[in-house]
């Protein structure tokens, strides 16, 4: 065991040696109540940062080398607008969409750097018997998506080039959605069935973006939405252990298609089949599925029509013959990390938790992580425990913090067990060393630098309130407001 702990320590020491580059630093004074937002303009190779406090919104436009091109400032919208939930951009016009906490109030803020113009206006939006599904910006267009209660009808409120939101109704009643018992149900019933509070049903769908490598804490969620295609929205549902449902909505004509990709079948009374758990992850045109019991682990790769590409089966006493790293358990911090000695520990622990798989592609290879994530809850002052999140409040991130910040710090207050794997384009195992990703470098940098943390009294945890993370020109960037020195800093991390 000591040897394993030493190996984990050597791994961390190796990570510390990776350097990050500070690409930009400039003077900036912001008040206490502050938040941040970024827009990436790939066409013109620009980054626009919106740096907001309780009184004003300061927008700064950078070129691709982070030289400041120009800036605009205007008043922050009314107090009822709590956060930025998305944006749209077209030919030099930028529109930020602000929303109240309950999303009953929506406002739009306009910026044009060439004309040096800004203005703010309310948007009249009546949500009738609707629940918010997700707020997304795809291909420079903002989508506010709702579902009509007790139906399979989605409503899309879509931004146009003038900052308006136009409604499009998508009726999915002809499609057969499944609940956790693998029975046919409305989409609304399937989505709210697993909610924490039955008296206040909510729709919780995790956004998987290509902005940074997704963590297991996000990919282990039951419902996910993928936005890696510019003209298609893809939802996955893993509420039952029989199959993964894939819902695709074409964003040009809003036609929809639902497919079901089966998980491996486990015979009744075999491998503790009644304790099976499963999940999935999409990448390119493939679906990666994990299914586990206390005695067996299946990892299956198929195309999104269900045609199998490869499958790995591991029994609890067997070595995982397709892994490229040790099996790690990480509790709350990358510094609280140990190596698990026995394969059965891995299979047992992920089955006792929320199993998941995550993957990203680099230089033609698929870098894959298999494991699980579980909330660490605080049962009493000074006490800790494991659970599903009922005893503590998880960090909440609006669009201002973006998917990537929530992703980067998502292992905070988590018990995560994982191993890394490397595959070729056909998902054959590649016996090669896995290099440290930009995501892991940024995560370690975050934990090593106390200046990046804002100490708060909420459950005694650190909230990274002054950070943004974004991908630009194939690099990962971390932006931070240093309130002590009144400076804004941007760091870069390479693969």
Say what each PLM segment does.
Residues 20-84:
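Start-of-domain marker
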Residues 55-60, 103-110, 151-159, 241-249, ...:
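Structural motif
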Residues 75-78, 123-126, 169-217, 259-273, ...:
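Surface-exposed loop and turn segments in beta-propeller and other repeat-based domains
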């Amino acid at each position: 065991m000591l040897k394993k702990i030493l190996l984990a320590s050597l791994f961390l020491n190796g990570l510390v040696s990776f350097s990050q580059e500070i690409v930009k630093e400039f003077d900036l004074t912001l008040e206490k109540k502050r938040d941040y937002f970024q827009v990436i303009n790939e066409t013109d190779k620009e980054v626009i940062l919106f740096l907001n406090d309780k009184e004003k919104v300061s927008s700064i436009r950078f070129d691709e080398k982070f030289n400041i091109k120009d800036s605009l400032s205007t008043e922050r919208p009314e107090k009822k607008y709590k956060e930025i939930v998305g944006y749209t951009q077209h030919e030099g016009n930028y529109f930020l969409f602000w929303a109240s906490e309950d999303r009953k109030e929506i406002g739009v803020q306009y910026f044009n750097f060439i004309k040096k113009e800004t203005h703010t206006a309310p948007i009249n939006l009546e949500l009738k018997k609707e629940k918010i599904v997700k707020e997304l910006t795809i291909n420079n267009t903002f989508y506010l998506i709702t579902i009509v209660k007790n139906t399979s009808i989605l409503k899309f409120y879509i931004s146009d080039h003038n900052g308006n939101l136009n409604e499009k109704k998508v009726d999915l009643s002809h499609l057969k959605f499944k609940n956790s018992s693998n029975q046919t149900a409305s989409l609304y019933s399937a989505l709210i069935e697993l909610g924490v509070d039955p008296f206040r049903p909510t729709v919780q769908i995790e956004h998987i973006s290509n902005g940074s490598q997704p963590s297991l804490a996000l990919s282990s969620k039951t419902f996910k939405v993928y936005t890696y295609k510019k003209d298609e929205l893809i939802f996955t549902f893993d509420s039952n252990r029989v199959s993964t449902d894939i819902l695709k909505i074409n964003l040009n004509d809003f036609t929809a298609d639902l497919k079901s990709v089966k998980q491996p079948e486990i015979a009744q009374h075999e491998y503790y089949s009644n304790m099976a758990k499963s999940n999935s992850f999409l990448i390119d045109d493939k679906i990666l599925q994990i299914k586990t019991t206390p005695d067996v682990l299946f990892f299956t790769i198929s195309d999104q029509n269900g045609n199998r590409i490869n499958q790995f089966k591991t029994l609890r006493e067997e070595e995982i013959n397709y892994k490229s790293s040790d099996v790690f358990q990480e509790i709350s911090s990358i510094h609280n990390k140990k190596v698990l000695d026995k394969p059965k520990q891995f299979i047992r622990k992920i089955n006792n938790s929320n199993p998941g798989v995550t993957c990203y592609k680099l230089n033609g290879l698929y870098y894959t992580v298999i494991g699980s994530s579980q909330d660490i809850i605080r049962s009493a002052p000074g006490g800790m425990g494991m659970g599903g999140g009922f005893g503590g409040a998880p960090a909440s991130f609006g669009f201002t913090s973006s998917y990537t910040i929530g992703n980067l710090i998502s292992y905070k207050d988590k018990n995560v067990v994982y191993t890394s794997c490397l595959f070729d384009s056909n998902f054959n195992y590649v016996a090669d060393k896995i290099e440290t990703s930009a995501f892991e470098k940024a995560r370690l940098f975050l934990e090593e630098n106390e200046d990046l943390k804002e100490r708060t009294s909420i459950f005694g945890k650190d909230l990274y309130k002054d950070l943004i993370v974004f991908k630009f020109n194939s690099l990962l960037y971390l932006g931070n407001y240093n309130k002590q020195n009144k400076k804004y800093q941007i760091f870069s991390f390479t693969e």
